[in-house]
């Protein structure tokens, strides 16, 4: 048979063993065909079981049968060249190469995952501010008052402010946009902008700064379950209230949720006025009948109508997200009800999903609230395969090291190429796990740098961890590419960035504002 496997770089060891058993990859059987399509530089789903070492084994087994797509059709020539420079300098340096897979044998380098500069088709339109083209990459540098390193939280807070301020500045400037050769000009809009983050905490930091400046945004995560939302917990209380409308405690709990949005004054009035409370209970009794006769989805739609929720929610910040989550949960509940018997079974199902959201499927991932003109805050994982006109990467200097605390196990390579899970691991094995973390961070950095079409704004600064006063930037993906493993001080980091910018056309390094409004 003929098989075509896309995104092969995200294959797990078990999946590869299955493919290899069927097709015997190394045999190159002329009576069958197995086409493996993937970019190992974008293997970033280790948390889902993907293993780049499986890709590398397949690459070794198919030596001489490799085909490379060497032209970028997404980005401008200037941006592609600048990204090439980031990785080429590390690839050319003596050591392990840009992606930490290069080894040396008798003075000869062997690298199963080399960085190979790509060509660019380029774009006709230019991203401009006034008459000037915006540089392909802008590095915004921030250090403490004395030029020294900052703790992660402090650096994150300031760079989130700088990121939001730059976005506001561009959006408020009518001369910032995309110019075509024929004179056509499209002004920059919020939907043209994506901010890439690694964690929910980073997303919250930058969205808070955008909100303070009146810029609406949406957060898109590859793994955030709708069952972790406040709407899910509130909906659980509401289902209990509708299922037992004669239980005054359940009814009061349902009415007191953020989902219903009743003020403290109204809730106090309902607690003191039996007649008013009975009127609300009657609404729930009616909804209970709808649930029994037409199903949970019909009941929840009636809830929206009878309680006047959409208008109430949409008048507040975040209301569109609340409505989207509510409708998403209603759909999931309706699907689950087809396999469950009775209202209490459905309530128990929802409670279980809330307690264990990690067990969910892609259907449970939070949905985009609308196609409105919003700035997108996206995890790097979620951004893979996508493209955006302008990208912000405000926290590019940060990283999360693998430490003994919080690491219940590590995976250790074996002679046969497999990796063994160890619960009781040595310091050397822990160091290997952190090295693997850095390898994946480098690939995540590559994914982030290759998302924009026109321009990339990066926040950067000297970073310290814990009580140490020393810079640890070399342990991040972006820092390793600039310095290798050598630890250097804050002043030297700035000098290297300046030298890199001077040697790289269309890359500028600027001081981030020390104070941001």
Predicted regions: what is each one?
Residues 5-256, 264-268, 289, 295-304, ...:
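Conserved motor-region signature of P-loop NTPase helicases/translocases
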Residues 2:
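Key residue(s) within conserved catalytic/signature motifs
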């Amino acid at each position: 048979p003929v098989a075509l496997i896309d995104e092969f770089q995200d294959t797990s060891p078990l999946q590869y063993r299955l493919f290899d058993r069927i097709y015997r990859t190394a045999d190159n059987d002329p009576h069958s065909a197995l086409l493996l399509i993937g970019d190992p530089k974008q293997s970033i789903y280790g948390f889902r079981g993907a293993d780049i070492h499986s890709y590398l084994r397949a690459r070794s087994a198919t030596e001489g049968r490799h085909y490379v797509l060497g032209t970028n059709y997404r980005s401008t020539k200037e941006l592609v060249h600048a990204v090439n420079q980031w990785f080429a300098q590390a690839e050319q340096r003596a050591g392990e190469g840009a992606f930490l897979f290069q080894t040396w044998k008798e003075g000869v380098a062997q690298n199963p995952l080399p960085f190979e500069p790509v060509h660019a088709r380029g774009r006709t339109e230019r991203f401009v501010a006034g008459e000037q083209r915006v540089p392909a990459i802008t590095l915004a540098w921030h250090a403490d008052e004395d030029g020294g390193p900052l703790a992660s939280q402090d650096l994150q807070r300031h760079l989130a402010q700088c990121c939001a301020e730059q976005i506001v500045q561009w959006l408020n400037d009518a001369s910032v946009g995309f110019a075509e050769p024929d004179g056509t000009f499209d002004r920059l809009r919020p939907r043209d902008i994506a901010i890439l983050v690694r964690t929910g905490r980073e997303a919250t930091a930058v969205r808070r700064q955008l909100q303070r400046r009146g810029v609406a945004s949406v957060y898109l995560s590859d793994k955030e379950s709708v069952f972790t939302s406040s709407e899910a917990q509130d909906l659980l209380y509401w289902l209990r209230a509708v299922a037992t409308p004669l239980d005054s405690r359940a009814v009061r709990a349902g009415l007191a949720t953020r989902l219903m949005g009743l003020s403290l004054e109204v809730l106090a009035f309902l607690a003191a006025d039996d007649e008013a409370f009975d009127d609300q209970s009657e609404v729930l009794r009616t909804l209970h009948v709808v649930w029994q006769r037409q199903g949970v989805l019909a009941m929840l739609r009636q809830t929206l109508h009878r309680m006047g929720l959409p208008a109430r929610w949409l008048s507040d910040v975040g209301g569109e997200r609340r409505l989207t989550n509510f409708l998403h949960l209603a759909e999931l509940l309706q699907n689950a009800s087809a396999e469950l018997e009775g209202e209490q079974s459905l309530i128990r199902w929802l409670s279980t999903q809330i307690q264990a959201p990690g067990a969910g499927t892609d259907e449970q991932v939070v949905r985009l609230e609308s196609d409105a003109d919003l700035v997108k805050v996206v995890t790097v994982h979620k951004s893979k395969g996508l493209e955006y006109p302008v990208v912000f990467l405000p926290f590019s200097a940060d990283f999360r090291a693998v430490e003994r605390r919080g690491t219940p196990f590590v995976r250790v390579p074996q002679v046969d190429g497999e990796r063994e899970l160890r619960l009781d691991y040595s310091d050397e094995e822990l160091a290997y796990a952190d090295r693997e973390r850095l390898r994946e961070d480098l690939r995540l950095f590559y994914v982030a740098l290759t998302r924009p079409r026109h321009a990339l704004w990066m926040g950067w600064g000297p970073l310290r961890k814990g009580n140490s006063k020393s810079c640890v930037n070399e342990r991040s993906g972006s820092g390793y590419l600039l310095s290798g493993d050598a630890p250097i001080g804050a002043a030297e980091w700035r000098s290297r960035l300046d030298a890199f910018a001077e040697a790289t056309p269309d890359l500028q390094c600027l001081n981030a504002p020390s104070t941001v409004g």
